[in-house]
Design a protein with these regions (language model features):
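Extracellular/periplasmic solute-recognition and catalytic clefts
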Residues: 1-31, 157
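Ligand-binding "clamshell"
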Residues: 2-15, 148-151, 164-178, 235-239
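Periplasmic-binding protein-like
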Residues: 13-26, 30, 34-72, 116-117, 174-190, ...
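Structural transition elements
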Residues: 34, 62-96, 113-116
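Extracytoplasmic/peripheral linker and loop segments enriched in polar/acidic and small residues
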Residues: 38, 131-142, 169-236, 256
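Ligand/substrate-recognition segments at binding pockets and active sites
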Residues: 61, 95-160, 181, 202, ...
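Long beta-strand-rich cores associated with HINT superfamily self-processing modules
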Residues: 232-256
C-alpha cells in the first residue's frame, strides 16, 4: 500500500477501507498441554502485535481489540491483554505456571502473511522459553482442523457482517469442535449471544458484546491480532461500486 501511494499508476485512485475480517491466535482449551491458564496468559502477554503489523502487513493494517471491528456495536477501544508484548508480565506468568520446556505447534494456513505472522509469534514465545513449531497447511487440511482434539495453537481468520451477532455466533459452546476451534465453553457468553439478538437498547447491546469479548480474553484462549484492511486501486475512468468494507460489487461498476 505504501509503495502504491508513492508510485500510483497514472489516472488512478487508491481508496482504503476498514475490513470486517478478524485475525487471532487461538489456543485449544481441551489440549492437556494448554490446560494451565497461567501458561495461556503468558502466551497472550508475550505476543507483540505491532511487530506483526510491521512485518506481515507493512503497517497497512491496525491492531485489533477483539472480533468486532471499529465503528460497529460492541467494538472495544482496548483489549484486556494489550497490543504490545509485556515480557516482564509474560515471564512472571510463566514462573507462576510452573511449566518448563514447553513445546507447542501453531497451525497456519499456508499464505505468506500467515507464515510471517507465525514466525514472529515463534520468536516472541521463544523469549519466554516456549518453543513453537510452525505447522503449515493447505486449505483442504487447514479448514478441517476444528475437529482435531489435539490442535494446540492456531492462527485463524474469519469474516463477519456489520451486525456483531454473526461474530459471536462461532464461539458459543455448541460450536466447539466445529468453528469454535479453541473449544471455548462459557455459559455467560452463550447467554449474551442469545440475549443480545433481541436487545433493542443500543447502549446495552454494545456493552453486552464488549463483555462477550472480555470473556473470550479472560479464558486465556485468544490473542487478537488485526482486522486487516481493504485497499482498492481503480482507474479514474470508472465509477466503482464498493461496500463500506471495501469489497467490490463488480456488477455495479460503470464508466465515468
Amino acid at each position: 500500500v505504501e509503495r502504491l501511494k508513492a508510485n500510483l499508476p497514472a489516472n488512478s485512485t487508491l481508496a482504503e477501507f476498514p475490513s470486517l475480517f478478524y485475525v487471532w491466535v487461538g489456543m485449544n482449551l481441551d489440549n492437556p498441554k494448554l490446560k494451565n491458564i497461567k501458561l495461556r496468559q503468558a502466551i497472550q502477554a508475550a505476543i507483540d502485535v505491532p511487530s506483526i503489523m510491521a512485518a506481515s502487513y507493512f503497517v497497512a493494517a491496525e491492531p485489533s481489540t477483539g472480533i468486532i471491528a471499529p465503528g460497529l456495536s460492541g467494538h472495544r477501544d482496548q483489549s484486556l491483554t494489550g497490543i504490545e508484548a509485556n515480557l516482564e508480565k509474560a515471564k512472571k506468568l510463566m514462573a507462576e505456571s510452573g511449566e518448563s520446556n514447553v513445546s507447542l505447534k501453531i497451525s497456519v494456513l499456508n499464505k505468506s502473511v500467515n507464515v510471517t505472522t507465525a514466525q514472529i509469534i515463534q520468536a516472541n514465545l521463544a523469549a519466554i522459553g516456549v518453543t513453537v513449531e510452525v505447522d503449515l497447511h493447505e486449505g483442504a487440511t487447514f479448514w478441517g482442523l476444528g475437529e482435531d482434539k489435539t490442535l494446540e495453537l492456531v492462527l485463524n481468520r474469519y469474516s463477519m457482517t456489520p451486525d456483531p451477532y454473526y461474530a459471536t455466533s462461532w464461539f458459543i459452546t455448541e460450536q466447539a469442535g466445529v468453528w469454535n476451534w479453541e473449544r471455548f465453553a462459557n455459559a455467560e457468553f452463550d447467554k449474551i449471544h442469545k440475549d443480545a439478538q433481541s436487545e433493542s437498547d443500543l447502549v446495552k447491546r454494545d456493552a453486552m458484546y464488549q463483555r462477550a469479548q472480555d470473556l473470550m480474553e479472560e479464558s486465556g484462549a485468544y490473542k487478537f491480532i488485526t482486522h486487516e484492511a481493504t485497499p482498492n486501486v481503480y482507474r479514474n475512468t470508472i465509477v466503482p461500486a464498493l461496500r463500506p468494507d471495501g469489497m467490490p460489487l463488480y456488477r455495479y461498476f460503470k464508466k465515468d
